[in-house]
Amino acid sequence: MNDYKLYQCAQCGFEYDEAVGWPEDGIEPGTRWDDIPEDWSCPDCGAAKSDFFMVEVERR
């Protein structure tokens, strides 16, 4: 089990999974939320990084 977290956009529901990253924006798998630039925005709706919230997930 790992300690990667999942963050969800409050505007559109887009999910950022630290384990997966977002290679389309140059964010490699394993990139922690805190290491993503503050000016990064939701790829689906353009919402600010501050509009995301952490989601509790159980990984197996």
From Swiss-Prot:
Keywords: Electron transport, Iron, Metal-binding, Transport. The keyword Iron applies. Binds 1 Fe(3+) ions per subunit. Residues 4-55 form the Rubredoxin-like domain. Its cofactor is Fe(3+). Pfam families: Rubredoxin (PF00301). GO terms for molecular function: electron transfer activity; iron ion binding. GO terms for biological process: alkane catabolic process. It comes from the Bacteria. Fe cation binds at C9, C12, C42, C45. Involved in the hydrocarbon hydroxylating system, which transfers electrons from NADH to rubredoxin reductase and then through rubredoxin to alkane 1 monooxygenase. Belongs to the rubredoxin family. PANTHER family: RUBREDOXIN, RUBREDOXIN-1-RELATED. This is Rubredoxin 4.
